[in-house]
């Protein structure tokens, strides 16, 4: 038996097919992964993401600590609640984890990290924190739901009080706010508008049930994966890991090399990698029959690469993928499938946003 979120029984009751996900018993789907995918693109779906790890960082050196620990620069965050996508790197510039950090004040931040890397992340955070005047606290007293889709604002309005909804009405993307016992952020992993809602664990099931009563579709890990891949969002362990730098994972935009005098873990290795040149993560589109899959070989101008994530796209009706390839890549490539070379188009990662193709 794996670890269970506070919603385990609710998932079983809702007919979920449960699977092991990095030691957690999590719902893969509730009957139809494709229907759940379409619900998020066209209406609204809710995911239990309580397996994610929330870490609060406080202390007089909180900002200095995070400026050293993380590749992006938290000093850029000036507005209370503002979120930033970033990563923790090792000395070789490899990605220990990608995460979101929220700014409350220069002495208080919140990080949300992946469940698959939880133990390693927490050990790394504590090790680095030992040299700073900070405290780090895992918030395992909280659960988290992701409410995603074009109708997310309507649905959340129906389960909050008028006063609570007024607090978040019109909130810009990538911002979080304390609303009573909840922490509500305009973030997500689907390419749709929506919210991630951090809730005291004992209140989680009531909120889940209220959302299901409001005709929000419960969604599992299967739809979460096809949605994030359509949106061109990385999955840790597939699209990058501790042996891959952000520069090779289409995450260069989340590394702050300026100001030049800020030292952060992995900086020197990244600067060297930048100077030497490196592979890049691209999107692939195949409108022929067949499905692009993780691990397939990609042939491009000047070399070979590999598909890191691939799937049939329910929104587009054909197969899409992300692949790490030599930087010499042109507009087309070939993927080896069943001993045949299939032609594919090379595009920027990201295929669907707000329900529409961006190809």
Curated annotation (Swiss-Prot):
Q: Which family does it belong to?
A: Belongs to the GcvT family.
Q: What name is this protein filed under?
A: Aminomethyltransferase
* Alphabetic keyword roster: Aminotransferase, Transferase
Reactions mediated catalytically: N(6)-[(R)-S(8)-aminomethyldihydrolipoyl]-L-lysyl-[protein] + (6S)-5,6,7,8-tetrahydrofolate = N(6)-[(R)-dihydrolipoyl]-L-lysyl-[protein] + (6R)-5,10-methylene-5,6,7,8-tetrahydrofolate + NH4(+)
Which SUPFAM superfamilies does the record cross-reference, listed alphabetically? Answer: Aminomethyltransferase beta-barrel domain (SSF101790), Folate-binding domain (SSF103025)
Q: InterPro entries this protein is in?
A: GCS_T, GCS_T_bac, GCST_C, GCV_T_N, GcvT/YgfZ/DmdA, GcvT/YgfZ_C, TrmE/GcvT_dom1
Name any one GO molecular function: aminomethyltransferase activity
Entry GO CC: cytosol; glycine cleavage complex
Q: Domain of life here?
A: Bacteria
Q: Which GO terms describe its biological process?
A: glycine decarboxylation via glycine cleavage system
The EC designation for this entry is: 2.1.2.10
What is the purpose of this protein?
The glycine cleavage system catalyzes the degradation of glycine.
- Oligomer and partners: The glycine cleavage system is composed of four proteins: P, T, L and H.
């Amino acid at each position: 038996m794996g670890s269970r979120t506070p919603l385990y029984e609710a998932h079983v009751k809702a007919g979920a097919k449960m699977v092991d996900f990095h030691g957690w018993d999590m719902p893969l789907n509730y009957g139809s992964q494709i229907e759940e995918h379409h619900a998020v693109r066209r209406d609204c779906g809710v995911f239990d993401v309580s397996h994610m790890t929330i870490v609060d960082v406080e202390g007089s050196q909180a900002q200095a600590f995070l400026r050293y620990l993380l590749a992006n620069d938290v000093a850029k965050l000036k507005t209370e609640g503002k979120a930033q996508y970033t990563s923790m790197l090792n000395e070789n510039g490899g990605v220990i984890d990608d995460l979101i950090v929220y700014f409350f004040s220069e002495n208080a931040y919140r990080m949300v990290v992946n469940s698959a890397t939880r133990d390693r992340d927490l050990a790394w955070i504590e090790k680095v924190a030992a040299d700073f005047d900070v405290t780090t606290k895992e918030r395992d007293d909280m659960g988290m739901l992701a409410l995603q889709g074009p109708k997310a604002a309507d649905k959340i309005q129906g389960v909050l009080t008028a006063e609570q909804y007024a607090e978040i009405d019109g909130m810009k993307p990538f911002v979080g706010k304390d609303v009573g016992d909840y922490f509500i952020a305009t973030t997500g992993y689907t390419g749709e508008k929506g919210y991630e809602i951090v809730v005291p664990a004992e209140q989680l099931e009531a909120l889940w049930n209220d959302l299901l009563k409001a005709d929000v579709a419960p969604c599992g890990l299967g739809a979460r994966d096809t949605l994030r891949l359509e949106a061109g969002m990385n999955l840790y362990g597939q699209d990058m890991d501790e042996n891959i730098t952000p520069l090779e994972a289409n995450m260069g935009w989340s590394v702050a090399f300026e100001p030049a005098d800020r030292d952060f873990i992995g900086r020197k290795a990244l600067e060297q990698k930048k100077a030497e040149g490196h592979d890049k993560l691209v999107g692939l589109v195949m409108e022929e029959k067949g499905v692009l899959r993780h691990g397939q070989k990609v042939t491009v101008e000047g070399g070979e690469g590999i598909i890191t994530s691939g799937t049939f796209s329910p929104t587009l009706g054909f197969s899409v993928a992300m692949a790490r390839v030599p930087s010499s890549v042109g507009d087309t490539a070939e993927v080896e499938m069943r001993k045949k070379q299939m032609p594919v188009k090379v595009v920027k990662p990201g295929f669907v946003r707000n329900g529409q193709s961006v190809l």
